[in-house]
Amino acid sequence: TKQIKKMISSYVGENKLFEEQFLNGELELEFNPQGTLAERCRAGGAGIPAFFTKTGVGTVIAEGKETRDFDGETYLMEHSLKGDLAVVTAWKGDKLGNLMFRKTARNFNAPMATAGKTCVVEVENLVEVGDIEPDQIHLPGIYVDRIFEGQNFEKRIERRTIRDS
């Protein structure tokens, strides 16, 4: 739909429209290892302009990037990322945007939220201010610009079949 001009990702899937736009030169693509991508976003949210990592040294990921040696090891310089919009889902949030995440959502949601110039959050449970204990808050509402309670949170589980029964 041509709503973005550049995709920075660790994996893009098998979307035919995305593939077509990339192959036609209509969409720029930058791959990053998943941990590096997460750290770039965390750094952006923390106001850190760049950092060094060994991940990607000697691969296509390193092409065109500054390198530096520390204690005999080569590192790549990665610039932090700040997005125009961060869209995050949380388990619970209050009306001021204080959020609680559950399980694997605790990994990347908070850093992604802080790296967005605008952060929109969909919560499973929207509660009143004060209903979340301060020690239970994973992301303070200062980072949240909009919050709403979502609907129909279906938890899909894949069923893997190895052989016929």
Regions found by a protein language model. Give the residues of each.
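Conserved alpha/beta enzyme-core scaffold
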Residues: T1-S165
